[in-house]
Every structure is written in C-alpha cells, then in structure tokens.
C-alpha cells in the first residue's frame, strides 16, 4: 500500500496486477461488542479445537551471508548521502500446530501487548502480537508512539535491569529513535494544527516477554479526523521505513527479497469519536488452510531492524531472530522426553566409565533433545542433562540389591518448557527373539509437526500400545491418512531388502528415532515409502523389523 500512496516508489506488481494481493480490507459493522480481556479469551477458547497448540521456531528465508551483502549496500547508500537509515526486513517461514485461535491465546497470555489482534477469515488468519501503536485519535487529539531500539531480556532481575539501562543509554539506539521521532513529527504536521505537535516523552523503555523496546511519544491537535486524510499523511509508519521516508521506501522496494504484505502495515478500528491503529509487527499471517490437516498450518512472520551507518550486520541479524522468539515463548502444556537404555556396569568399573558406556546411545538422545528444545522453545542445558543421568545411575546402583540379576534399565528423562528435568526408571525385562505387531486402528496426520518430536502429548500412541500389549503384541503400527506406513507406537519400522533396510521418510509423519538415525548415518538403512502390502509381505518372508534406542533392532511379525 505504501507504494501506491507514494508515486515515486515502484509498484512490484506493475504490469501484472493479477498477482497483486489486496492492499487492505475494511469491514463496516452496524454494532460492535466491546469485550473485556477475559470475555475475549473465553470467546476464542469456545471456538478453538482441544489440541496442543503452539509454534515451531521459524525458518529464515534469508541466509546470514545474503543479509550481510544487503547491509553492505545499505551502508554504501548511507555513505553516499542517499539515506540516513533503512528498516530492512525479511520473512521467516513458520509452522503452527493446533488451532490458530488457541495459538493466539497462548501467545497473548505469554506476552500481553496493548495492540494485539486476531483476524479469523475463511481464507486466512492473522495473529498479531504488536506492541507498537501507529496512531490513536480521541476527539481532535492524535498520539503516535514509534518503537525503535531493542535488547534481549535476562533471566535474573539485576541483569535484566542492566540490559534495560544499557538500551536507554545506547547512543546508537537513541540516535535511531530520535531520527524516527523527527520523521513522525513531520508526518503529523501534515494533519495537525500549526504549533500543536509536541514530543511528550523520549527514549522510554518497555519490557516484553523476550525483549526490551525503546519508544517515544508524540501528540498533536488534528485539523481533520478523516481517515482519507490521516492514512495518506501517516502511512506507512516511519519506524518501519527509515529516513528520509520516501528514499528509504525506494531502497526497501529494491532490496527486500519479498513484498511485506500485512507485516509493518496496520490493523485498527474506528468509531465516531476514536481511532486506534497498530504497526503490524510481531504479526503472523497464515497461509490459506489446505483442508489436508487440522493439526498444522504454515505462515509467514516478518522480522527486521533499523540499519544505520554503524550497524553491525551479525548483531542486526541476531536481533531479527530475537524478535521472533515470542512465537515459542508460551508453555505448550507438554514435556519433551527421552527414553534411554542404561546398562549397569560392574561396581568396580563404574567410576572409570564415561556416560556413553553406561547409556549406549546417550549422544543421540542428547542431540535429539537439544534440537527439539530449540525448535519448540524449551530451555535445555546439556550439563544438567548429563548430571541427572549420573544421578539416576547412582539411584539405581543404590537400589540394585532389590533387583538381583537385572543389568538393564529403562530411564526416562522429561524436559519441561522452563528447562526443568525429571527422571523415572524401571527394570528392562527381556523380550522374545521375534516380537509381534498389530495394526493401529487410528490414522496419523502426516502434516502434524509434533509427530517429529518426542512429547508427552502422545495419548494416541499410548492407547495403541495398551491394546497391543493386551493382545500379547509388542507394538501397534500406524499408517497416515494417505494409507502409507509411518511407525509403531514405540518403535520405527524397517523392511529388509537384501543387505539394506528400508524405513518410511519423516514426511510421512513419524518420530525420527535415535536408532533409526544411527542406521541411516551408517548407510545400513535408507528412506522409502512403505505400504501395508509391503509390511505384510515382509512379515510373511521374515524381513520385517522394528527398533528403538532402548531395544535395538528386532525381528518382527504381524499377528
């Protein structure tokens, strides 16, 4: 929309207007229901599906190397006197699991902001957690509060206060903020009565769940309240363009890798007396639902930062990623866990053995848990993980006399969203040489991203295993909605073809097991689509295998 309001900024869709998305939507209502926060939450909850809901950490569409090259161009333009600052942005691909309405509630509760918005339309949804006011009108008074300057939060209070004070004292951030204040004073002058534009405050620090933000406030008395005058004068907000505004917009149009869409636009409302509009940052725009999955949606989150002459490209890239951390801030209500095999050594050898000799696949479990924690926003400390495993070993040794003759144990470590670790263990009894399998009656949603992680949200698996055990079987095999074989409730499935093992690819919808990863890395297994017929034939011919890190690879057959 900014390009359409400013004739000197080229329209990216010029010559092919059929591809241009709508520049905006306006809805007019005869009446509106004004809800309290609790009423709004209850309204949304009543429409949300009862599923775990959250976000997987976004995947950057712009590499650090390409970003650095873009920053070099911006700094050259600043050196040439073409611009003073550019707010350079780029998109992240984001995957949601669960209902978008529940995701929005979780995000809003974890990071309350004054200008959040949830838009639910048949063809798309918007989850905006914007903390930034574009403008607010009350009678003939208008207020703007640009946001420019970011620093991360700290866990401890003293460190967090130090971060806030450092941001407030930062000459670089104050200079950027003041540059945008001057720009918005100029914009307000277009619609304000002469002499009424006032800077109410400078360099305020606002704390949010993952970041501190620097803001300033400016107000004025309007000479008009018409949106048809306010929008052309003020849009887009200077905090997300740079300065000079038009020159910065021209550079943005030429250098950014994709149109911004709603990101850095505005979402607002208007009545006869009042208007309020946000700057649509921290805003996730979901792709249209495909109808293939109720458990997963994809979307785009824009991130960016203001670039000036002394900006450090690596630091700016890190700041952009930091601004996306709010997506994984809420506790999703489940734990991540790993189930490890512990082989208790002889007491006289115990003190000399490394952890990997006691927990044979320790490294694979640690790697998978660390990766899952990063993707889903869980706190994870590798030293803490190692420490609790040593504690469990000591506990089992202490109680070993009550388990005479048992040398192998099942150890489960649960990781909470806040990084806390809990352990449980039990003896690991032997199994038959060939294990029996049944078919699970439920189908897996192969698009559900949570299937790729080992979480406590696994009632579907637990129920299938319970049925299998009742039928004297080890496990139940699941298929996805397309009828392709995925995995067992507690094992990965393999079919032996000559000297090679075939196992379903992760895209079918399954947990990438630790044993499975080992076999793939060693070249002993490869991914291949498997059908029910493939499994039946392998069972008849003695080529069917299932396996996990706890039990290893086991011959199997269908009951």
Predicted features along the sequence, with ranges:
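Extended alpha-helical targeting/anchoring segments
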Residues: 1-340, 480
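Helix-start/capping segments and mature chain N-termini
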Residues: 177, 210, 214, 315-410, ...
């Amino acid at each position: 929309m900014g390009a359409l309001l400013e004739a000197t900024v080229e329209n990216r869709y010029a010559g092919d207007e059929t591809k241009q998305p709508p520049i905006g939507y306006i809805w007019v209502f005869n009446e509106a229901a004004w809800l309290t926060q609790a009423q709004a939450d209850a309204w949304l909850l009543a429409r949300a599906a009862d599923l775990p809901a959250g976000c997987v950490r976004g995947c950057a569409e712009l590499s650090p190397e390409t970003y650095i090259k873009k920053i070099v161009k911006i700094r050259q333009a600043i050196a040439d006197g073409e611009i003073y600052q550019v707010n350079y942005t780029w998109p992240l691909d984001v995957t949601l699991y669960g209902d978008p309405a529940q995701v929005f509630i979780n995000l809003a509760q974890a990071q309350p902001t004054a200008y959040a918005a949830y838009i639910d339309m048949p063809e798309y949804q918007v989850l905006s957690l914007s903390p930034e006011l574009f403008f607010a009108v009350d009678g003939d008074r208008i207020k703007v509060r640009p946001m420019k300057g970011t620093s991360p939060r700290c866990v401890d209070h003293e460190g967090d206060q130090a971060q806030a004070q450092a941001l407030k004292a930062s000459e670089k951030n104050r200079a950027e903020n003041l540059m945008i204040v001057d720009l918005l004073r100029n914009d307000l002058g277009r619609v304000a009565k002469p002499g009424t534009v006032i800077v109410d405050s400078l360099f305020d620090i606002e704390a949010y769940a993952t970041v501190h933000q620097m803001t300033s406030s400016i107000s004025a008395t309007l000479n008009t309240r018409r949106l048809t005058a306010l929008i052309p004068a003020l849009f887009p907000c200077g905090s997300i363009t740079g300065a000079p505004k038009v020159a910065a917009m021209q550079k943005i149009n030429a250098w950014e890798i994709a149109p911004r869409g709603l990101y850095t636009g505005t979402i607002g409302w208007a009545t006869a007396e009042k208007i309020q509009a946000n700057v649509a940052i921290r805003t996730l725009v979901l792709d249209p639902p495909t109808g293939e999955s109720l458990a997963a949606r994809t979307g785009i989150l824009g991130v960016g930062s203001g670039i000036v002459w002394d900006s450090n490209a690596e630091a700016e890239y890190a700041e952009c990623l930091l601004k996306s951390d709010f997506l994984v801030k809420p506790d999703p209500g489940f734990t991540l866990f790993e189930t490890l095999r512990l082989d208790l050594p002889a007491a006289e050898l115990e003190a000399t053995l490394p952890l990997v000799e006691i927990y044979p696949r320790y490294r694979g479990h640690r790697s998978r848990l660390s990766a899952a924690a990063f993707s889903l926003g869980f706190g994870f400390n590798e030293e803490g993980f190692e420490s609790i495993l040593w504690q469990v070993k000591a506990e089992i040794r202490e109680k070993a006399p009550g388990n005479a003759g048992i040398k192998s144990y099942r150890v489960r470590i649960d990781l909470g969203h806040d990084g806390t670790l809990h352990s449980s263990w039990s003896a690991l009894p032997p199994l038959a040489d060939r294990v029996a399998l049944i078919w699970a009656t439920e189908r897996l949603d192969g698009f559900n991203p949570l299937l790729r992680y080992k979480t406590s949200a696994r009632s579907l698996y637990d129920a299938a295993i319970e049925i299998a055990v009742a039928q004297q079987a080890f496990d139940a095999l699941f298929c996805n909605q397309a009828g392709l074989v995925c995995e067992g409730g507690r094992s990965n499935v393999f079919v032996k073809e000559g000297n090679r093992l075939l196992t379903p690819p992760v895209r079918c919808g399954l947990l990438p097991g630790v044993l499975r990863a080992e076999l793939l890395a060693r070249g002993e297994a490869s991914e291949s689509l498997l059908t029910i017929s493939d499994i039946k034939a392998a069972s008849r011919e003695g080529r069917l295998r299932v396996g996990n890190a706890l039990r290893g690879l086991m011959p199997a057959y269908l009951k």
